[in-house]
Amino acid sequence: MKTADNMQDLIQYFPERLRESIAAFGNGLTEIRLRREKPIILMRNSDMLFVDSNGKITKAVDSECVKVTSAEIDSFFYAICRNSVHSFQEDICSGFITLSGGHRVGLCGTAVVRGGKITNIKNINGFNVRVSREIIGLGEDIYNKIFCGELKNVLIAGAPASGKTTILRDLCRLLGSRYKVSLIDERSEIAAVYSGVPQNDVGMNTDVFDGYSKADGLETAVRVMSPDIIIFDEAGSQDEFGYMEHAMNCGIRICASIHASSIEDIKRRIPFWKSFDHIVMLGKLPKQEHRIFRTDEL
């Protein structure tokens, strides 16, 4: 398997004092956590790492570990908004901003609520930067066992940070070399489109619906692109399930991911789960083990 990181693109957003330590870590970072007046935390899968007073990476946390100042939190926020906060207001209210390269920055603070809806987030106090990574070949085992010879309806399930998006990205690359694929990339994490061009390899015959909601993307893809299969990440709402079922009824295959801890969880949440041919349950990183279930045997 070949791993491709976009760390160089990502490092530019961080305060200068922190860039060298992040760059020195090299590949392998999965998350970078910044909190106001708290130590910067570098996550390597489940390992929690810190930066000591000499700029070195350490597993030990003490009073000398590098802390993120309030000024650096504000600087990082303006950097990821490209100094135009109002342009990202909708993303901010949704709780995340997607950067070039497909990296996603989750943010938290104090919600401003009007009419039962979040209209702004003020006093932002923390960020979780999820590092986007292409792992070419990661999806080959699933592809060879499920899609050998014909397309199937497949659900990729797992806990948060279990690698669902990375698996989907590689399956998209593989499927897009043989079939007409429509990719609904609501958060710009899979293809990482920048200036209209996917930065990640999602297959030569893949049409990317970048920034579309899953419901809108599914409806549009079915209507205008005649796909053999539609791929998208993190199905969850009843509207999305409804459009998935509609696409299946139109003879289009679906390959989607879902947050789920067990097969029983999936059965409870998706009434038409038997319409899927296979369910793939992912284990936790870094082992990335998975189990493939045939729904007609469940």
Task: Walk through the language-model features, giving the residues of each.
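N-terminal accessory targeting/assembly segments
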Residues: 1-101
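Conserved lysine of the Walker
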Residues: 164
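Hydrophobic positions on the alpha1 helix immediately C-terminal to the Walker A/P-loop
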Residues: 167, 171
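P-loop NTPase switch/communication element
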Residues: 175-219
